[in-house]
A protein has these predicted regions:
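N-terminal active-site segment of His-dependent metallophosphoesterases
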Residues: 1-72
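Active-site-proximal loop/helix segment associated with metal-binding centers of metalloenzymes
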Residues: 2-5, 9, 102, 111-112, ...
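Beta-strand-turn-beta hairpins that frame and shape the catalytic cleft
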Residues: 20-27, 128-134, 215-217
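Active-site neighborhood of phospho(di)ester-bond hydrolases with catalytic His/Asp-centered motifs
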Residues: 28-30, 53-57, 85-90, 135-136, ...
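Active-site environment of divalent metal-dependent phosphoester hydrolases
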Residues: 33-37, 61-64, 91-97, 141-143, ...
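Active-site neighborhood of divalent metal-dependent phosphoester bond hydrolases
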Residues: 51-52, 62-152, 157
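Conserved beta-sheet core of the metallophosphoesterase superfamily
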Residues: 78, 108-111, 179-241
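MPN/JAMM (Mov34/JAB) isopeptidase/deubiquitinase module and associated MPN-bearing subunits/adaptors
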Residues: 242-254
Length: 254
């Protein structure tokens, strides 16, 4: 890996809101959580011309190869900054909102902790496509328009939504906290998706929610054996005029 400033410079070129190109295909990868085999397989299959890779956060903790996983992703981001995009998950926000267990962070020296914390602060919060997709780690933030995502500050309520937010298929907006995680219901989901003019949400974060929810307008991906025996990714055709439901995505086990 290059020095800290080189990595920060590359990540800083991306805004908090990534606007994906309208060409080729996008591969969305859920929590990898130290499952380096999953990350390596994604690159072996899809790191090629015509494909953009969007990782949805949570690269560390839980799995056996957290450091190897995040260092590999950062190295690849340096090699192909316009082909690989790294979103922030709650496990990358440890320095902002600590949690436990956090085996990756707790094993680092003070110097190493500072190094990775500074890098993770530059990760993006969301990605959108021209044909109706929005991707975040948790839930879409309660902003009035997409451009406001660029102004979200770490530690804010909006930041907690995109990194820590849970969804449940029941009526309601904000439904309170469970285990420190803010929970949002069906009314919030519908309101935000309509307000942001997006048709399908692709997210990660919740390993035990159904993969497809909200009448096929929400897809939750887990791409790690840390939680489940099966690992999934999703591929979107960025050249389609519109993507209106999850059915129009290619969901694959890796």
């Amino acid at each position: 890996m290059r020095n800290l400033e080189s990595i920060k410079e590359i990540l800083a070129r991306d805004s908090r809101l990534i606007r994906l190109p309208a060409q080729g295909k996008a591969v969305f990868i859920g929590d990898t959580h130290g499952d380096f085999d999953a990350t390596e397989k994604v690159f072996r299959l899809y790191f090629k011309p015509g494909y953009t890779l969007v990782f949805l956060g949570d690269y560390v903790d839980r799995g056996k190869h957290s450091r190897k996983n995040i260092e590999f992703l950062l190295k690849k981001k340096l090699e192909a900054p316009k082909q690989i995009f790294l979103l922030m998950g709650n496990h990358e926000g440890y320095s902002v909102l600590p949690f436990s267990p956090a085996d990756f962070w707790e094993r680092l020296s003070l110097e190493e902790n500072k190094f990775f914390s500074e890098i993770c602060e530059f990760l993006s919060f969301a990605a959108i496509t021209e044909n109706g997709l929005i991707a975040v780690h948790g839930v879409p933030p309660d902003v009035n328009e997409l451009g406001e995502i660029d102004d979200i500050q770490s530690g804010s309520e909006h930041w907690q939504q995109v990194t820590w937010g849970d969804l449940v298929e029941m009526p309601g907006n904000f439904l309170g906290y469970y285990g420190g995680r803010p929970i949002y219901g069906e009314d919030y989901f519908k309101r935000k998706m309509n307000q942001l003019r997006c048709k399908v949400l692709i997210r990660a974060h919740q390993p035990y929610i159904e993969t497809v929810t909200f009448k096929k307008h929400c897809l939750t991906l887990m791409t790690s054996h840390a939680y489940k025996p099966l690992r999934y990714i999703a591929i979107a055709d960025l050249e389609k005029p519109a993507i209106k439901t999850v059915d129009e995505l290619e969901i694959l086990e890796i």
